[in-house]
Each structure stands twice: as structure tokens, then as C-alpha cells.
Design a protein with these regions (language model features):
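Accessory N-terminal region flanking or inserted into the helicase ATPase core
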Residues: 2-6, 14, 102-206, 213, ...
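Flexible, charged surface loops at secondary-structure boundaries
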Residues: 27-32, 194-202, 222-223
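Short catalytic/ligand-binding loop motif for oxyanion handling, primarily in non-cytosolic enzymes
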Residues: 45-47, 72-74, 211-212, 237-240, ...
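Phosphate/oxyanion-binding active-site loops and adjacent basic polyanion-contact surfaces
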Residues: 11-15, 88-92, 177-185, 249-256, ...
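Conserved P-loop NTPase-based nucleic-acid remodeling module centered on helicase motor cores
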Residues: 31-145, 151-154
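Anion-coordinating catalytic cores for phosphoryl-, nucleotidyl-, and glycosidic chemistry
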Residues: 2-67, 84, 218-219, 244-246, ...
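Extended, H/D-rich, highly charged conserved domains that either
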Residues: 202-286
Length: 376
């Protein structure tokens, strides 16, 4: 049992290092204990593809790229829980709708809200978030009691009463019959030590932070697995008393780093000296000095002296183009035309394009309409 960190700024090769280490283990012993790459749900396929694309590995049963949910399912196959029926958001929405009608006479605020458009979906989102962050019906009961004492007929007291009631009833309806995504993490935390995966080496990559349920699952892995390696986008190691300011670019991942160290120390698991990657230039930006400079000095606004030729968008070293538009519609239209040109003329793939805006609500309708007109 040991915990290790691979730290580095964006593009410094953290993922490549993790993949290379997995390939080395496979080359040494194709049939050894499990090797698990724990990544976000949307990255499982690309991670597995990247693992097999290089290194002469045509296939393997030992190494797998898994999300928290798929890892939980693997553990439940061995320790129990797969008999429960998986339930998605639509299923929970229908269950909540039924519960609101069933307990209408006990509700103080929400009795007539079930038929309102979007109400059940919003309530389900709220209850899911509460569960994800460890807010139980009992904790809500305590809060509702305090609100009741302050103002028995107040809006907050009535709202907390109804949320607590429906939360408890939903949990009761799910218990023993259904399995939602949040419950699967609890099964993972409880059952990991008893599963065959407790002999695994684990690499965690692609995360900036974790929910309380994910931290509990990671703690179980740190306590039981042969080794856990966590890759984080962080400029350097931080101690408990030197957390960067809340507006610092690396504040969220520094918090994650410190909390994971504390989990390991509390469990009595040794923490190895962090590996800090500082290649110059960073591999991802090797062909784009302007982007490399932007990443390195994003927080300090340090200017970069470049030849005039680099400012031409057609120049290979021009990694950043700044354009002004008369209004948002013209801005979105120009972006759509540029995307279309790059796809048709430069061979860019749709999946290689991202559109980022500061406030999506200001642009969402315009983007949807304009991109639809352009066939994007």
C-alpha cells in the first residue's frame, strides 16, 4: 500500500507517464494483478485506445480504463449488489412524481407543484446533489427543526420539511430494490477491500477534484490497493498551511492534493515523494510557442515578444488569434464560418473543436441557431 502523486502543469506529460508505467507493467508480466486506469466517464474509451495505440500491445485482460461507476460495478459483481435494478434520472423523476401525489396531504409547500413544468426534475437534481455531498435526511431533519423554532410557518421551514420528507421517502423506495449512481459509490467504498481488485495497481487521471462519495471510495483504494498513483494538474506540491489563494489557478487541485495526502496519513499509508514534471517546452505545446507562453503566464499577464510574421493566422507559429466583433451575433457567425473552413479545408474533425464562452446563457440560443444554420 502506498500513495504517489504525479504533478505538473497542463500538457507536461502526466497522462503519458501513467500510460507508460502501465505499459511497462504489461511488458514485465502480461498476466499479473489488475492494472486500473481510473478516469472520468467520458474518457474511458480514449484512455484505453491511447494505451493500446503504442508500445506494441495488441490486447490485454490485465489493464483496464474504468470510471468510478464501472469500477463500482466490477466490485459489486464480486461482493454483491448487482441484483439491484439500476435506475436512471427518468426513473427517479417518475418515482418522485408518484411520491409527491402519495404524500400530498403531508406536504406543506410542494403539494400542488408536481404538475409544474420542470419541478420534479429540479427537485431530483437537488436531492441527487445532497446525496452526492453527504447531506442525509437526518441532517435535513435537524436543519428543519432549527428553522421551525425560528419561524414555524416560515417559507424556509415549510420548504425544508417537504424536502426532508420526500428525500426520506425516495431513499426508502430505492432501498433494497434499485441502485442509483450515488449508491454505487457507497458499494465501491464498502466492498473494495474484499474484492480481487484490492491487489490492483491504480492510476487516477483526469480529475481536478472529487465528491465526498468519491473521496470515500478513494480512501478504500488507498487503504487496500497495492499502490495508488494520482495525476493532478498542479504547479508544485503544497503543504496544509500553504494553500494558494482562492482565486489562484491551482487552488482547486491544491485542495485535492492536500486532502488526499491527509486521507493516506490518516490510514497509515506511506506517501511517496511527488513526481513533478517540468519539461521545457511542455510536450503538448512543443509546436506552438504562443500557446506555451499563454499557459505558462496566464495568471501573471507577462507579455511575449514575437516576430510580426507570427501574428498572421496562416503562420504555423500563430497559436492565438484575437478578433473583435460588432455584437454577439456577428461573433458567433464568424466562429461558425471559421470552424466550417477548418473542417472543410484543413481536415479538422468536429470532435477536435471546442467553443468556450464566459457565460453560456448569453450565447446558448445564438450558438444553437447559428451552428444549426451552418450544419455544425
Amino acid at each position: 500500500m502506498k500513495l504517489r502523486f504525479v504533478l505538473g502543469r497542463a500538457g507536461t506529460g502526466k497522462t503519458r507517464r501513467c500510460l507508460d508505467e502501465v505499459r511497462e507493467r504489461l511488458a514485465e508480466s502480461p498476466d499479473g494483478p489488475p492494472l486500473i486506469l481510473l478516469v472520468p466517464e467520458q474518457a474511458t474509451f480514449t484512455t484505453e485506445y491511447a494505451l493500446l495505440k503504442e508500445g506494441g500491445i495488441s490486447g490485454t485482460m490485465r489493464a483496464q480504463a474504468l470510471s468510478f461507476r464501472r469500477l463500482a460495478f466490477r466490485v459489486m459483481q464480486e461482493t454483491g449488489g448487482t441484483a439491484l435494478v439500476p435506475i436512471g434520472e427518468n426513473g427517479k423523476n417518475m418515482l418522485l412524481f408518484k411520491l409527491i401525489h402519495r404524500h400530498a396531504d403531508r406536504l406543506r409547500l410542494f403539494a400542488g407543484s408536481a404538475g409544474q413544468h420542470g419541478f420534479v426534475e429540479k427537485l431530483n437534481e437537488l436531492l441527487t446533489e445532497m446525496k452526492r455531498y453527504g447531506v442525509t435526511p437526518d441532517k435535513l431533519d435537524e436543519l428543519a427543526g432549527n428553522a421551525e423554532l425560528a419561524s414555524p410557518d416560515g417559507l424556509l421551514a415549510r420548504k425544508l420539511h417537504d424536502i426532508r420528507l420526500l428525500y426520506a421517502e425516495l431513499e426508502g423506495a430505492l432501498a433494497g430494490r434499485y441502485l442509483d449512481a450515488e449508491d454505487s459509490l457507497a458499494h465501491l467504498a464498502r466492498g473494495f477491500a474484499e474484492s480481487s481488485l484490492s491487489a490492483a495497481e491504480i492510476w487516477v487521471d483526469g480529475f481536478h477534484g472529487f465528491t465526498p462519495a468519491e473521496y470515500a471510495a478513494l480512501e478504500a483504494m488507498i487503504r487496500s490497493a497495492r499502490s495508488v498513483t494520482v495525476a493532478l494538474t498542479l504547479d508544485r506540491p503544497y503543504g496544509p498551511g500553504e494553500l494558494p489563494g482562492e482565486l489562484d489557478l491551482f487552488h482547486p487541485t491544491a485542495e485535492t492534493y492536500i486532502r488526499l495526502r491527509e486521507l493516506a496519513e490518516r490510514a497509515g499509508v506511506p506517501v511517496e515523494e511527488p513526481i513533478v514534471l517540468r519539461p521545457e517546452p511542455a510536450p503538448r505545446w512543443a509546436d506552438s510557442p504562443m500557446l506555451a507562453h499563454l499557459e505558462r503566464h496566464y495568471g501573471s499577464r507577462t507579455p511575449m515578444a514575437v516576430p510580426d510574421a507570427w501574428l498572421d493566422p496562416a503562420h504555423p507559429n500563430c497559436g492565438v488569434v484575437i478578433r473583435a466583433a460588432a455584437n454577439r451575433r456577428a461573433e458567433v457567425d464568424a466562429a461558425a464560418r471559421d470552424i466550417l473552413r477548418r473542417v472543410q479545408e484543413d481536415g479538422l474533425r468536429w470532435r477536435d473543436v471546442a467553443v468556450m464562452v464566459r457565460n453560456l446563457s448569453d450565447y446558448a440560443d445564438l450558438i444553437e441557431q447559428t451552428f444549426s444554420d451552418y450544419g455544425i
